[in-house]
């Protein structure tokens, strides 16, 4: 629980309110990689056969291996970044009709690189995909502006939907 409370906003709220955190080996992750990986964000509840719809949808799995690695903070931050991308960024739209998630994927290369960019942005040091010493000032500013815009966008969208009864 302490690791969750140490997450930066907006990740802390998402993990506390919208995502289950499970200590264990994710069944589909283990089937795919033939080992228990450090962490997995599972938005739809995949089982070992790749079928989805199980009760662990919207979950972050952290394995014992991940906990004992000494990298728990960065692993949890990376997986929380996936949750933020899935639950928030894909619903945060630009005036072009493109989601900020798609825009961020184009900027950083893919979902894994985006999650690692968030690790760097929030001061983490260990990543698995995106190997940098530091995130550039330009990328840091871009992420900051994206978070600010999406917080504003989602808050106002929810207000309008509530006001209009949708």
Model regions: which residues?
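Soluble non-cytosolic domains of exported or imported proteins
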Residues: 1, 66-75, 109-113
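A metal-dependent hydrolase signature that marks the N-terminal structural subdomain at the beginning
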Residues: 1-47, 143, 147, 151-155, ...
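Sec-exported extracytoplasmic/periplasmic mature domains
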Residues: 5-12, 81-89, 119-127, 148
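Extracellular/periplasmic catalytic domains that process cell-envelope and extracellular macromolecules
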Residues: 12-14, 50-56, 109-113
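Active-site scaffold of zinc-dependent metalloenzymes
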Residues: 26-73, 80-86
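Surface-exposed substrate-engagement region within the catalytic domains
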Residues: 72, 76-80, 85-87, 91-103, ...
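Metalloprotease/metallohydrolase-associated module, dominated by Zn2+-dependent proteases
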Residues: 96-166
